[in-house]
Amino acid sequence: MAMAMGMAMRKEAAVAVMMVMVVTLAAGADAGAGAACEPAQLAVCASAILGGTKPSGECCGNLRAQQGCLCQYVKDPNYGHYVSSPHARDTLNLCGIPVPHC
């Protein structure tokens, strides 16, 4: 029981961190870079990126729309480790999106 509660708390903490990341990235996104980079659209991918679950169709669609922005997100020193994590790579692969080489 204690182990299940600990896992639930870690998942909640991970989701909270992801939401902070999304809000911060959204605030710092370069609005003048042609295609709109809107990291808040990647919030639907939180469970796939953080927990390794199968990405939803909406997640894959949003990743495709943000594909040109992924290197920008990877290079952000505060959040790049989320975007370049093994689960993020798995998510990209499951969505049929090439992993960027930044």
Swiss-Prot record:
One of its GO terms (biological process) is lipid transport. Disulfide bonds join 37-71, 45-59, 60-95, 69-102. It holds the Pfam family Tryp_alpha_amyl. Aleurone. InterPro entries: Bifun_inhib/LTP/seed_sf (IPR036312), Bifunc_inhib/LTP/seed_store (IPR016140), nsLTP2 (IPR033872). Potential phospholipid transfer protein. This is Probable non-specific lipid-transfer protein.
